[in-house]
Each structure stands twice: as C-alpha cells, then as structure tokens.
C-alpha cells in the first residue's frame, strides 16, 4: 500500500514529469537550431538580451536559450546534452539542487542555466571546490560561452585588483568558494570605491554543493591581521595616567562613570609625550590609549568590576556578582586593565573581517547547486538555504553491484582482507580504487601493498592537477589507486580497454564515513554511464564509527561463536545498524550547524548594517549630513546622561556636560554652566547644537571644500573600521565564553543575542563619539590620506584536502577534561574552569 501511495504522492516524480515536458520542448527545437549558421546562432544571444530588456522574463526565454546552448555545445565541444541534462539545467535555473550521479555531465548541464542567467548582464558565478577545477572548466566551457558571444572570467587567489575586476565584470566568472568569499570581505575593507572588485551578488551555481554548503559550512573565512598597536602604548599610557590628579587633570562623574581630561590634563599629556596637539589625527591611537588607561584607573575597581585570577583579569557581572569567564572588555579596555594590574598584556591578533560560507552564499539573489549526493541532506538544504533537492535519473541505468558490508573483529584483520582482495583483482587485471577516511590509513595500506609487490598510486588531495591525471588513469587495466575521500573530485574515471569484460572498476571502502553521503560518493566513482562495476566496504569493530555506537555486543557475539580475525560477518542487520549510526551522527552534525547558524546570524545582521553604512560613506559626495546626525546623537546622549529624568533639575550635573563639551566638542568657554542653568534638556541640546554647528561652519571656511570632504571621509572610515574590528573580536570572546553561563535556566543563545545587541549599540555610540571629537577638535592638514587600520591576511581554511575532521569554530559546545581550557589559560580544562564541574 505504502508503495502505491509513494508512487502517487512522490514529489520527486511530479517534479520530473514537469521537467520532462520542458526538456521535450527544448528537444523539439533541435532541428531548427541545427539549420542556423554559426553567425545566426551567435546572433541569438543579442536577440535574447534585447527581449529580456523589453520585459520578457528568463522563464519565457528558457526553452529557446537552452536549445541554442545545446546546439552550440555540439559544434564547439562535440557534446550534445541529453534530455536528463536539460532537466538538470532547469532545476538549476529555478534555484534548486540537481542530484546527478557521477559521470552524468554536471559541468555541461550547468552551461544552459549559466548562459540563460548571464543574459541579464548581472554576472553569474560558477563555484568549484579547487582552483584546478575552476581553471579547467573556465577554459573548456569558456570556449562555448565565447562562441555564443558572452565573456568569461577566472578568479584565482593572488590576482591583482585589476585582474579581479576584469574577471568579475565578465558575464560569467569561475572561481573557488574561498576566493569569492574573501573578495566579498576585502571589498568591505577598501578605502576607495574604485577598489571594489565584486558586483552585487546575483546568481551562483555551486558545483559539489554538498561539500561547500554542508561539509564546509562551519569553516569561517577569516581575514586577520595584527592591529598596528603594540602593548608598549598600554604600558606608557598607564605610567602617565598614574601621575594625574583628580579634579585638576581630570574630572570624574560617579553616577555616569564618565571620566574626562581637563585642559590642564591635556597640556600635561602633550608635554609628557612631546607632541603639540593631542587631538591631531596622527595621535588618534595615543589619545585612545590615554582614555583607556584613565577609565581603567578611575572607573574600574578591582574586586568590584573585575577580579584577578591566575594572572588573568576576569569580569564580574554587575547584576549577579558572578564571574563572566571568557568575556573580555572590548576596544582595548581589557588590555588597559592588564597594564594597570601589571599583568601580561594579551596581544591582540585582530580578526578584521569574517563570514561563514552559509552566510556568504545566502546573500545571492538566487543560488543553485549540483552534486552526485544530496538527497540525504535534503532537510538541511531546505531549512537553511531554501533549496529543494531534485534527483535527476541517469541517462542509462546503473548496473553497478553494491555488496553488503564485510565486518571483521580487528582493524588488522580488516586490512589483511582488503590487501588480499586487491591482490586477487589486480592479478586478473581489474582496476581497483581504494577509498580511505584518513591519510594515515592510505599510508598503512600503501606499505602493505609494497610488501606484496603490487604497484599503486596514492592520492592525498595535495596536488589537484596531478591528481586529476592519476584519477583519470584509475580505470586502466591493472591500475590500483588509493585515495582519501576528497581526492580527485570532479574528475571522471573512464574505463580502459578490456576492463568492462573484467567487471569494470572495483571500489573498495576501508571504513564507513560518519556521513552516508561521502560513502555514496565513493561508490559512485564506479558504474558511470551504465558501465559495469562493483563496490564493497570492509569494516572492523575497532573503527571509530563502530566504537562510537556500541560494537561491544557484536564483539562478545563473535567471541562466543569462536570467530577469528579472518572470518567476517556479512549481515543485513549489522549494515542497518551502521546506517542508523550514520543517521544519528548526521543528525547531530545538522543540529550543530543549525546552532552555529543561529549564533552566526547575530553577527550577520550587524555585519550587514556596518557594511551598508560603510558603502554609503564611500559612495556619498558629501558626508556632512551623516556626520551632523552623529554629532547630534552624541550631544543628546551626553545631556541625557547628566540630566536624568528621575532627578530634580537642581541635582543635574551641568558641570559634567560642560566638562564633556570642553574635552571633546567645543573650545573652553563656548558653553558655560550658566548658559545651561534653568533650561530643559531639550533646550540645552538645541543650544549646544547651535554652537557646534557654528564651529563646523567656521571650519568649512578654513579649508577648501574638497579637502574638508576628504577629511570627513578619513575620520568616519577610520572610526568605523577600528571599532568594528574591536567589536568582532569582542563578539568572538563572548561566544567562546557564553556556554559557561548555561547555569540557572539561562539560554546561552538568548544571552548571546541580548549582549551582542547591547555591545553593537555601544559600538555605534563609540563610532559617533570618535567621529564627533575628531571633526570638532582635530586640526586639518593638507596631506590627508585614508589609512587601513590594520594589514589583513586571508586565512585559508584547508583546501579540500582529505575530508578534514571538521573543527567546529565554536570550541564551546563540549570540552573534554583533558582539552585545553576554552578560557584561554593554556591549562587543561580539568585543572582550570572544569574543576568545579
């Protein structure tokens, strides 16, 4: 009964029926296209572009456009896409995932939707897992696109800005996921609009989509740099601040915890550091450090705001009095306190920009992908990326024989059996591909084969181009190839002469991977395009996956039956148990990625706000309007801080307002306490605003307008970049430490969202204050230059080497007792924060 229902309601079947109709329409245009000359075929591209501009949608053009590409492929590449490839192409155009088995021509399938979407002129990105594949596909498929009158770009790491701009301005751009992501981050750090390389993200087709959007989803791309500030400045500023006297050199308001240098204090600083104006732009960093040291000494009290434990400064939660492990004050205040207490100052390696692949690819207007194995992760694709998985049938039926697993007691017994199997197949000339999970396993097998005198190749995903050659030869008579999971992906194994008669390519798996998908990828290397083949997995009860999910009972059973190491069990029950173990691991991994995404979303929203505002700054001709808003909100904040609604007007601290204005916004005497007395806060704000505006106008008259505009831009960019960089760092520290708060029914994610939001608000306020101060107080020089706040390096996650055991970026979920403590002390967890657990 269930089978009948499935037939009627199987959504994949319904999809395929619809796709087949479209493929038939494309197919029907075949003869008509074949009659066109090369020139007429090329003209079609211009005709489509014109029709699109006149309001026809891409869906209206789809059938004809696909037929044109199909004919073009026949003429240029000598390949004519099958009907199933047309169906796959439609799935990609609709922003979904086409699951197509190995050897079914995914690369050719992608040409149709890529061509169609490139007609918009908005740029299509074709994303692959490594640069070798990107270069190969750009070269081979590029011939087809260029024949049809479109331009093709290749985006590789190490290219100059001009080369990258040219690559991105092409209709179609090939590149790796890492490079597209890094370019996005670098574009949001540029100082001039002309230096941006990417256009707005429109449509991406991701090859090996499961590898990039699921296996790599937890790997963040990071551009890091050491901020150009040394710990020396903290020490110097600390020594200077120790010499200052309250109410002479600085003023302190207990209630709002704000502290400011007086005119006398500023003069003292200028004398101490041998400079002429503390508010000169070139002394931004020094000024910042003095302010930090002042706050550390005056507003932060040991054993009230923080404690010192094991040579570390640990923050005390002001509401609960609990220690907030893993949390650091942002913006350098933590380092200033370390200097005050004479502790070792933690050097700041700064994360200048970071994004995960999940969030980068979700920014495309339309995203599509193709792979041989995606159905097992369908739920994740749907929930996170809103993409359906459509399984496209093979052009010819698969006749590969997938044998049930053989399970041995020990690893030693298993490997002996594997080598024996290889030797037998090699003796009759059948090619063998052996898949391993780790590099060590490959090397162990290689040693065993050497002893037996069997010639073989070992691939460890180090050199992509060389590997592609070896993999291409793996189907020749007598070839033996050992490969870690990911090695040579994207390259077909074609069978040599006489191999079909020997049973095709034999694939041997030496261990089940924790993901069924990766096992299926290995199997799928054999039996392509209706070729014969066989796949066999060898397992042992000592394998990691088996150990994780209770192999003890099986071990006991084998002992009872008196089975030795050379006898395997081959049972459906065990194979099912292995599959259910894999399902559990996949479920756990999905949950971990989902949780990571929830944490990451907090930073994503903040990143989008900052990057959008930063672009407005680069793009605007005149920033005065934006800056006036910033100064105004600073004035409102200051007045509201010192004139709280709950206090009587005579209790208001008007001196605090005047001290702040003198220190940061206006020359001394512009606004006095007498001017403010007897006024409502709103009136005070208007009065101060009028004075500030007048001073701003005065500045405008002192230097040429274009220089003033550049000065404004320099100040704003510098403030935004510096504060954002510190903020990313603080958010990372918060995330590392947040799990330690999972006591007393507190939801760590909710805490992270709330604190992250509060920290973001504080950062925006800090940006506004810095901009206001430098616009109003700094002297403007003639040779202004925009400066990077730090030099950035792209930190590459491993290119798809052996499936690296994923290191989740959150070291916070589960800490083993012997692992290094997440608080960063360098001690083992059990000797540090884990003592109490």
Swiss-Prot record:
Residues at which ATP binds: 85, 103-107, 492
Basic and acidic residues: bias regions: 787-806
Cofactor binding summary note: May bind 1 zinc ion per subunit.
Binding sites annotated in the UniProt record for Zn(2+): 821, 823, 832-833
GO cellular component: cell envelope Sec protein transport complex; cytosol; plasma membrane
EC assignment: 7.4.2.8
One biological process term in Gene Ontology: protein import
Cellular compartments annotated: Cell membrane; Cytoplasm
Protein name: Protein translocase subunit SecA 1
Source species taxonomy: Bacteria, Bacillati, Bacillota, Bacilli, Bacillales
């Amino acid at each position: 009964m269930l089978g009948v229902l499935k037939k009627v309601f199987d959504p994949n079947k319904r999809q395929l029926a619809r796709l087949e109709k479209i493929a038939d329409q494309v197919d029907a245009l075949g003869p008509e296209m074949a009659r066109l000359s090369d020139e007429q075929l090329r003209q079609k591209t211009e005709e489509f572009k014109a029709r699109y501009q006149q309001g026809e949608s891409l869906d209206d053009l789809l059938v004809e456009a696909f037929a044109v590409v199909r004919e073009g492929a026949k003429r240029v590449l000598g390949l004519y896409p099958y009907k199933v490839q047309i169906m796959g192409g439609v799935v990609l155009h609709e922003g979904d995932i086409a699951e197509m088995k190995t050897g079914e021509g995914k690369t050719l399938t992608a040409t149709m939707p890529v061509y169609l979407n490139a007609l918009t002129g908005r740029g299509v990105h074709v994303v692959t897992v490594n640069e070798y594949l990107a270069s190969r596909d750009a070269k081979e498929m590029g011939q087809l696109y260029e024949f049809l009158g479109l331009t093709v770009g290749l985006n590789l790491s190490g290219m100059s800005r001009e080369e990258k701009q040219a690559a991105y301005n092409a209709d179609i751009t090939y590149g790796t996921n890492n490079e597209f992501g890094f370019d996005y981050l670098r574009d949001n750090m540029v100082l001039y609009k002309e230096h941006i390389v990417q256009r707005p993200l429109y449509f991406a087709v991701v090859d090996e989509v499961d590898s990039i959007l699921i296996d790599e989803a937890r790997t963040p791309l990071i551009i890091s740099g050491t901020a150009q500030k040394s710990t020396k400045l903290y020490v110097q500023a600390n020594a200077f601040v120790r010499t200052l006297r309250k109410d002479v050199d600085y003023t302190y308001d207990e209630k709002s915890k704000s502290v400011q240098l007086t005119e006398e204090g500023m003069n003292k600083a200028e004398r101490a550091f041998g400079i002429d104006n503390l508010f000169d732009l070139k002394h931004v960093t020094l000024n910042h450090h003095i302010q930090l040291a002042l706050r550390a000494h005056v507003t932060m009290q040991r054993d009230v705001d923080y404690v010192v434990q094991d040579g570390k400064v640990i923050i005390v939660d002001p509401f609960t009095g609990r220690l907030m492990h893993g949390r650091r004050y942002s913006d350098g205040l933590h380092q200033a306190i370390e200097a005050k207490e004479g502790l070792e100052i933690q050097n700041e390696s700064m994360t200048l920009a970071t994004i995960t692949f999940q969030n980068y690819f979700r920014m495309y207007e339309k995203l599509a992908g193709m792979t041989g194995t995606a159905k097992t992760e369908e739920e994740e694709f749907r929930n996170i990326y809103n993409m359906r998985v459509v399984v496209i049938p093979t052009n010819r039926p698969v006749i590969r024989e997938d044998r049930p697993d053989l399970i041995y007691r020990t690893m030693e017994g298993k490997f002996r059996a594997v080598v024996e199997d290889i030797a037998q197949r090699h003796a009759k000339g059948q090619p063998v591909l052996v898949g391993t999970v780790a590099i060590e396993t490959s090397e162990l097998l290689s040693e065993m084969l050497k002893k037996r005198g069997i010639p073989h190749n070992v691939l460890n995903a180090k050199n992509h181009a060389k590997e592609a050659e070896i993999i291409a030869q793996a189907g020749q008579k007598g070839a033996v190839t050992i490969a870690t999971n990911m090695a040579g992906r994207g390259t077909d194994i074609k069978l040599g002469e006489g191999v079909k008669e020997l049973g095709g390519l034999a694939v041997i798996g030496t261990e089940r991977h924790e993901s069924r998908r990766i096992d299926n990828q290995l199997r799928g290397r054999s039996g392509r395009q209706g070729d014969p083949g066989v796949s066999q997995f060898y397992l042992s009860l000592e394998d990691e996956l088996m150990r994780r999910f209770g192999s003890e009972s099986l071990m006991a059973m084998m002992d009872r039956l008196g089975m030795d190491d050379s006898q395997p069990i081959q049972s459906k029950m065990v194979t099912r148990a292995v599959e259910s173990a894999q399902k559990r691991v996949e479920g756990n991994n999905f949950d971990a990625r989902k949780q990571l995404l929830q944490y990451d979303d907090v930073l994503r929203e903040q990143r989008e706000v900052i990057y959008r505002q930063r672009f407005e700054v680069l793009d605007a001709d005149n920033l005065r309007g934006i800056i006036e808003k910033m100064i105004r909100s600073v004035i409102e904040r200051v007045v509201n801080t010192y004139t709280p609604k709950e206090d009587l007007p005579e209790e208001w601290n008007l001196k605090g307002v005047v001290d702040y204005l003198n220190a940061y916004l206006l020359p001394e005497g512009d606004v006095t306490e007498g001017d403010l007395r007897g006024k409502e806060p709103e009136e005070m704000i208007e009065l101060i605003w009028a004075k500030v505006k007048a001073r701003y106008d005065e500045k405008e008259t002192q230097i040429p307008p274009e220089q003033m505009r550049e000065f404004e831009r320099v100040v704003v960019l510098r403030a935004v970049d510096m504060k954002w960089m510190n903020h990313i760092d603080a958010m990372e520290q918060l995330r590392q430490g947040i799990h330690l708060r999972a006591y007393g029914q507190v939801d760590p994610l909710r805490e992270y969202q709330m604190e992250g939001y509060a920290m973001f608000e504080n950062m925006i306020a800090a940006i506004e204050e810095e901009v206001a101060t430098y616009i109003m107080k700094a002297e403007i020089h003639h040779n202004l230059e925009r400066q990077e706040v730090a030099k950035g390096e792209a930190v590459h996650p491993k290119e798809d080497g052996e499936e690296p055991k994923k290191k989740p970026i959150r070291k916070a979920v589960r800490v083993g007792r012997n692992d290094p403590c997440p608080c960063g002390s360098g001690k083992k967890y059990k000797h540090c924060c884990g003592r109490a657990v």
